[in-house]
């Protein structure tokens, strides 16, 4: 399955497909909520002695991917475009790979 095929499958199960305003809210809030669940799993693993259930974590990451797909579509992008924009930004920011000096001294408009 390609990333854009995944996005189409995610959209098939999304609600409010004809109203983009609530969909972006649902998407971004869902990203925050699911990311919080993943963070909570890590917190319990690192600080509370829990075992890290990687299968459960993988399912949470899948939920994050679903909300990312919905969010991207709500603003008129497919996931391939989003990913390419991100790679282009990172290549411009770190042409020779990650560099802490370049990270520390990023320009103000480098988002």
What are the residue ranges of the model-derived segments?
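Flexible "arm" and connector segments at domain edges
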Residues: 1-111
């Amino acid at each position: 399955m390609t990333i854009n095929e995944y996005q189409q499958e995610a959209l098939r199960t999304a609600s409010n497909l004809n109203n983009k305003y609530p969909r972006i809210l649902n998407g971004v809030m869902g990203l925050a909520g699911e990311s919080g669940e993943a963070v909570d799993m890590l917190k319990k693993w690192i600080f509370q002695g829990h075992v890290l259930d990687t299968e459960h974590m993988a399912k949470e990451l899948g939920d994050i991917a679903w909300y990312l797909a919905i969010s991207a579509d709500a603003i008129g992008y497919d996931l391939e475009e989003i990913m390419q924009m991100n790679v282009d930004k990172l290549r411009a920011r770190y042409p020779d790979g990650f560099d802490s000096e370049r990270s520390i001294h990023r320009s103000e408009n480098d988002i």
